[in-house]
Amino acid sequence: MQQNKWIKRIFVNRQVENSPLVERIIGRLKPTPVQLVDRLEEIQAELRLATDPIAESKRVLFLTDEKAFIRPCPCSPGAVPCGYWTIDLNLNCPLDCSYCILQAYFSLQPLTIAVNQKDLESELGAFLASTRTKVLRIGTGELGDSLALEAISGQASFLIDLFRDKKGVLLELKTKTSAIDSLLVSPPSENVVLAWSLNTERIIKVEEIGSASLEERVRSAERAVEHGFKVAFHFDPIIYYSGWEKEYG
């Protein structure tokens, strides 16, 4: 997936306009138009006027800061928490999976990248120092694909380096893309897992628009293993349709 074919406008929060990461992202997306804003609501007001606000939200990029990054993975009321934690560096996703809850949850949320990485470093240090568990599991695939914007943001590469020397913590980066080239230029990390959501070719083609094919995902996982990364696979969702048993088998 080529992000510069998806993103047609860049909005920048004035508070971060001088951020080096903002400058790098804008440079990678030239000549995409750039507009400074003071509040997310300014962008949302424009999205409301679009014929298809959900589709339009996937074509605009918002570079901003985030007040807090680390949160417990949400679960249903009354359910026992799984102990998984999330890091929300990116919000929303350029992929167009028909069944994805983000389609409704982020109906007026532009593709959002938090650029205040130093704040995440500080928050993570304090979080790990205060957490008492043998192995802490944390990932970035809850509110957006972990690698869909990697070519322009470099956030996954940043996280791998950030977690490289952290003991007792396992970072998972989950994706439906094949965007791992930038991750293969540096040494792998023992505590980082690259994970792929898999489905049948029929579901990928019809319901997971913009994502990598099944073959591309599996080949990317092979490349990751060859480089020394641990990998994982998620079969989620499994969809019932005529012939599903054979195709999933």
Model features per residue range: what roles?
Residues 17-22, 118-124, 154-158, 211-220, ...:
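Well-ordered, non-membrane alpha-helical segments in soluble/globular domains
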Residues 217-249:
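Conserved C-terminal portion of the radical SAM core fold
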Residues 62-79, 83, 101-195:
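Conserved Radical SAM active-site core
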Residues 88-105:
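Local cysteine-cluster metal-coordination motifs and their immediate loop/turn environment
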Residues 21-22, 149-152, 182-186, 206-208, ...:
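A short acidic (Asp/Glu
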Residues 24, 99, 162-165, 223:
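Alpha-helical scaffold elements within enzyme catalytic domains, especially in hydrolases
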